């Protein structure tokens, strides 16, 4: 049972790290490369979000995380990206 909890925690931690990596990637891109309206920016964001959603679905299907935990990860990232986008466009 302890090993299962350890694996579940590791899966949840990894998904959070991946979400943070996406957020950091977008921060760097917004600071240095392109505007949020740029098709390249949108393509990178869409691709990264799609990939993370697939990771979440995979972990949930294997029973490594609860689907609600996965939804929370995605919602947190979407909220952070929205704040970042607002801050960048209101400058």
Swiss-Prot record:
Which cysteine pairs make disulfide bonds? none
Which Gene3D superfamilies does UniProt cross-reference here? SO2669-like
Pfam families recorded: DUF1507
- Superkingdom of origin: Bacteria
Q: Which InterPro entries match?
A: UPF0358 (IPR009983), UPF0358_sf (IPR036270)
**Per the similarity annotation, which family is this?**
Belongs to the UPF0358 family.
Which NCBIfam families does the record cross-reference, listed alphabetically?
PRK13666.1 (NF010187)
Name of protein: UPF0358 protein Sca_0738
Q: Which organism is it from?
A: Staphylococcus carnosus (strain TM300)
């Amino acid at each position: 049972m302890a090993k299962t909890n350890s694996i579940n925690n590791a899966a949840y931690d990894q998904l959070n790290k991946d979400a943070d990596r996406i957020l950091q990637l977008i921060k760097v891109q917004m600071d240095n490369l392109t505007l949020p309206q740029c098709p390249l920016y949108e393509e990178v964001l869409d691709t990264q979000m799609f990939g993370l959603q697939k990771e979440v679905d995979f972990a949930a299907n294997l029973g490594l995380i609860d689907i609600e935990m996965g939804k929370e990860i995605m919602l947190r990232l979407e909220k952070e990206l929205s704040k970042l986008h607002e801050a960048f466009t209101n400058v």
